[in-house]
Design a protein with these regions (language model features):
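Phosphate/nucleotide-binding beta-alpha loop and adjacent structural elements of enzyme active sites
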Residues: 1-233
Length: 233
């Protein structure tokens, strides 16, 4: 059984309620554990997608953020949803400073098609062949692995929206959430990256279409980066 994440007090101390309805987020300083405040502005991709999603929701009860990272999308979800369930196999140093922990339930676990054990890379892409330093040490010296679970195993109630941004495992996440999708028909926000060979990094878009979902919004912020909103027909 996976218990919710417990954040360190020093991480929580960075939280400021006055920033919760702003676009200011703590972001990492490359190459260090330091953090700086950055104003992403209302046109940032997370806010644009969040705002668009509201057009397709008649109720706002429970949202799910898969690949929540530093809480850049999560915070916006807390503006509308009383309950937000967040998943990331890495515990971010910045999440608790960006998001009110009273509004979310965070799990430090990867989501996939079935329950399994696998060593993640420490990067956004769980299976990136290049490991971050702490994960490289685990790979070489420790007999520890990361847990992967299907979303359906959490039996979350009345899910209205699911956002998935996991750099390649999107289809696997969807396969592990079929019961939830069929029962609640949530709005889906999903990222797709175009690889060097011109192909997408996952087949989640086709999987959603096969489940009877249709694309209602698409934004291509870069030539290799697409985000979609899907709703059940």
């Amino acid at each position: 059984m996976i218990l919710p994440t417990v954040f360190d007090p020093e991480e929580i101390d960075y939280f400021d309620i006055d920033r919760q309805h702003s676009h200011e987020f703590y972001v990492p300083v490359k190459g260090s554990k330091k953090r700086i405040l950055s104003n992403l502005g209302p046109t940032n991709i997370h806010h644009v997608l969040y705002t668009r999603c509201l057009n397709y929701l008649d109720r706002k009860i429970n949202a799910v953020d898969v690949g929540c990272r530093d809480g850049e999308f999560t915070r916006y979800l807390t503006w509308s949803f009383p309950n937000v369930y967040c998943f990331d196999y890495r515990k971010s140093l910045y999440f608790a400073g960006n998001v009110s922990l009273q509004a979310v339930t965070h799990y430090t676990v990867a989501l996939g098609a079935t329950q399994s054990q696998e060593l993640g890379s420490g990067r956004n892409n769980f299976r990136n062949p290049v490991f971050d330093a702490p994960y490289q040490k685990r790979k070489l010296k420790e007999n520890t692995q990361d847990t992967i679970l299907p979303l359906d195993s959490f039996q979350l109630p009345e899910v209205n929206l699911i956002k998935i941004d996991v750099d390649g495992m999107e289809e696997e996440v969807l396969k592990g959430a079929v019961e939830t999708l069929e029962k609640y028909q949530p709005v889906i926000v999903i990222e797709e990256l175009i690889m060097a060979d011109g192909l997408p990094n996952h087949d989640g878009i086709k999987f959603l279409s096969d489940l009877g979902y249709e694309e209602v919004f698409k934004i291509e912020s870069q030539k290799t980066h697409r985000d979609y909103i899907f709703v059940k027909k």
